[in-house]
Amino acid sequence: MLITIDDVLSPEELAQARKLIAASRWVSGHVTAGPQALHSKNNEQLPEDAEHLPALRRLILGALNRNPLFFAAALPLRVLTPFFNRYAGDSNHYGYHTDNAMRLAPEGGYVRADVSATVFLSDPEEYEGGVLTIADTFGTHGVKLKAGSAVVYPSSSIHQVTPVTAGARVACFMFMQSMVRDAHQRRLLFDMDMALLQLRQSVGEDNDAVVRLTGTYHNLLRLWADA
C-alpha cells in the first residue's frame, strides 16, 4: 500500500524546516546505509551531531502525530527518529534497494521496519529528476510531491531515487514499526477506516451499521496487532 498525504507540514513549519536545513552542514549518506545499499547510495545526510537536527525531528514528528491519515495508514507502534537527506551535484542518486528489516533504536535494541515514510522539503520545480520510484505488489509508482507532503509505503518495497540532474532535492525519511506487521492486513484496515469515515459523514455516528462496522474494525485490529 502506497499512500500520499498532502500538507503534512503547515506553511510555517515548512518555512522553519527549510531555514534550519539551510543553516546545516551535510555529510555522506553512507553513514546509514546497509550492506546492500552501501553500493547504490550516493547522497548527503545531516549528521547526528548537527546543531538543528533535534529541532527538525521534533517538528516532523509533531506534524505526523497530529495527522489522522498518517496514523490510519501506518498504525505506528514505534517511530524511529527521522533522518534528513539531500540529493545534489555529484551526490545525486540512490539506486534500487530494500530498507533493512531491523533498525537500531537510539535508546538501544532494535525496531522492526514495517513502514517507511518520506516528507518532501523541496518543491518539484526546484530540481530535475529525483523521483522516488517504489516497486511492490501494488505496481511501480514514481513519487515527486510538493514540499510539506509525505508518502507512506511498506519498508519491504524495492525503491530508488533517480539521479537529480539540476537543483537540490531535500527530504526527511523515517522508519517505523507498525502495530500490524502484515502489509495486506494494514491495507484492509485502512480501506475499512476510510469507508467508515465516508459512511459516518453520510448517515451519522449513531447509525447501527456504523456502530457494528466500527466494532469490526477494532476487533480486527485487536486480532492482528502486535501491541
From Swiss-Prot:
**Any one GO BP annotation for this protein:** DNA damage response
| Keyword Cell cycle in annotation | no
Q: What class of enzyme is it?
A: oxidoreductase
Q: Which cofactor does it need?
A: Fe(2+); L-ascorbate
User: What EC number(s) is this enzyme filed under?
Assistant: 1.14.11.-
GO function term, MF aspect, one: iron ion binding
UniProt: Fe cation binding residues? 97, 99, 159
Swiss-Prot/TrEMBL keywords? Dioxygenase, Iron, Metal-binding, Oxidoreductase, Vitamin C
The UniProt note on the cofactor reads as follows:
Binds 1 Fe(2+) ion per subunit.
Annotated binding of 2-oxoglutarate, by residue: 169
* Record-linked SMART domains: P4Hc
Read off the InterPro entries from this record: Oxoglu/Fe-dep_dioxygenase_dom, PKHD_C, PKHD_hydroxylase, Pro_4_hyd_alph, Pro_4_hyd_alph_FE2OG_OXY
- Locate the Fe2OG dioxygenase domain: which residues? 78-178
Q: Which HAMAP family match?
A: Hydroxyl_YbiX
Q: What is this protein called?
A: PKHD-type hydroxylase azo0608
Q: What is the lineage of its organism?
A: Bacteria, Pseudomonadati, Pseudomonadota, Betaproteobacteria, Rhodocyclales
